């Protein structure tokens, strides 16, 4: 059997069935066909590292096992063939799925599966979207987003993946996972109106609590806004009601960010994120309105903070005066001041 030297020291790295075992040989990843013996060797290799991960409680050893599994996939100097990747992805999928049910191994297992970046891992990624661990759900969503392009060649599998992501986003509570699922859905070639509406609902949940915890919400707001903008740029269509919902949330985030920014309540890192948030809001609002009236591309961390707030007030409106937003969407009220109830 042809074997490929991984560049790893073939020493004992795991305990299987109570005995020490050396790393099994792996077929050359560049091979153009897979024999029965090749398939068996690939399965043995994946199973070996899954068993090694299951047999330890040392997170650093789990990371070593994960690295070993991913080396054939990520070695750009020796690219793996498509036929190898299909067999390898299936083997990793089957070997590591059982580890998703173990709290000690679930995170390293899903990171391993997600970073194979092959559509053969779809079943495990979909299953992990309902895991009790938020970090596992995040990586499951990321993994599915990364393979949506491959799955588009298989419409039934592609639609199934999108349905799983949409169902997950509809019930997800964790802000970071919401952002991750929205980003995954934005990787679709033609995002659906439902995907965009769900992402906008997620953004609305961030906006409703924004005045209470702005530093915590800023990164997830920015990530979700970018995902929504990507969906819209790819043709996702919003109903008038969802447009209003989106503009209301974006205006709220834009206004509250500008208020915190002007007040000096953000540290240096948060200030940089705030500038990104303001620009992201403006860009998304322009995409929704098919205009260039909300853009804040000209601002940067050196821009006078009071001037930024005045500019934003002119766009979103404030408690004293209506803004451009109310001219276009009369039903969308101006955002409240930070001192008021959001």
Predicted regions and their residues:
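Charge-dense, extended regions
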Residues: 323-342
């Amino acid at each position: 059997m042809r074997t490929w030297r991984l560049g790893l020291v073939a020493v004992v790295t795991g305990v299987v069935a109570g005995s020490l075992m050396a790393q099994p040989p792996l077929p050359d990843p560049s091979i153009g066909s897979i024999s029965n013996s090749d398939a068996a060797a690939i399965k043995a290799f994946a199973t070996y590292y899954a068993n090694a991960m299951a047999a330890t409680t040392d997170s650093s050893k789990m990371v070593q096992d994960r690295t070993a599994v991913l080396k054939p996939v990520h070695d750009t100097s020796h690219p793996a063939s498509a036929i190898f990747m299909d067999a390898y992805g299936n083997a990793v999928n089957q070997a590591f799925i059982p580890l998703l049910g173990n709290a000690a191994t679930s995170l390293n297992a899903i990171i391993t599966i997600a970073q194979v970046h092959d559509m053969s891992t779809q079943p495990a990624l979909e299953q992990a979207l309902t895991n009790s661990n938020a970090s596992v759900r995040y990586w499951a969503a990321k993994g599915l987003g990364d393979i949506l392009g491959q799955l588009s060649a298989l419409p039934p599998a592609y639609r199934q993946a999108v349905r799983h992501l949409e169902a997950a986003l509809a019930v997800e509570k964790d802000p970071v996972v919401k952002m991750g699922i929205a980003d995954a859905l934005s990787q679709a070639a033609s995002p659906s109106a439902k995907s965009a509406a769900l992402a906008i609902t997620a953004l609305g949940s961030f906006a409703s609590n924004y005045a209470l915890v702005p530093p915590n919400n800023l990164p997830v707001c920015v990530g979700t806004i970018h995902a929504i903008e990507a969906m819209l740029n790819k043709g996702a269509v919003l109903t008038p009601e969802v447009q209003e919902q989106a503009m209301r949330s974006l205006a709220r985030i834009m206004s509250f960010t500008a208020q915190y920014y002007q007040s000096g309540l953000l540290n240096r890192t948060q200030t940089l994120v705030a500038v990104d948030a303001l620009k992201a809001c403006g860009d998304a609002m322009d995409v929704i309105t098919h205009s260039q009236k909300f853009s804040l591309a000209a601002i940067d961390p050196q821009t006078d903070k009071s001037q930024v707030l005045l500019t934003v007030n002119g766009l979103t409106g404030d408690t004293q005066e209506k803004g451009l937003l109310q001219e276009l969407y009369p039903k969308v009220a101006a955002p409240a001041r930070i001192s008021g109830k959001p």
